[in-house]
Amino acid sequence: DLKELVETGVTPIMYYDAMGRLIKTKMPDGTLSRTEFDSWKQVIYDANDTVLESESSWYHNRTNHLIDAELIAAGKDPNREKMAADKAAKHARTPSIQHFDTLGRPVLLVDHNKNLVTDADEFYLTKVNLDIESNLRSVIDARGNVVMQYKYDILGNKIYQSSMDAGQRWLLINILGNPLRTWDERNHEFQYLYDILHRPTQS
């Protein structure tokens, strides 16, 4: 905890719970991030979310001009640093939340934002669909768009994917799981050849 040691280099202080999970990280600049664990969800607070908390000195030091001399010595403008602190405070208490299913898998992601004009809370939900073997089947964004969709063979190998941006793509693999042929809906096709020792020789 010596000031000279903490201020030299990057020395985050990390805290863990009894199960070995990272629950809090304190950074040398006074910012703080933490994670809350629950049976059905996980709440993630980044440095902006905790900026107004008593343990986070980053905002307090800049808005009250307590470290102006240090900032100037580091080539920074204290007034601009205060402006940055005030802007960061608008994002305070807006953690991200992951909701779990009965198998402990994340299936719903909630991004908590604030309207900069009205300061009203806004929540954006991303849904994740998994099959019984925990293979990712689809991702649906806050507007209801199917961003990604996947299909698998009986062994769990991915053989098809559909992207909202890149379109559809298929994959044919051999018995060892190595790709033999890939193609997409734009008629781009790739073939892969191997020698008798299953080393790639041509594509």
Place the predicted regions along the sequence by residue.
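Acidic, low-complexity segments
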Residues: 1-203
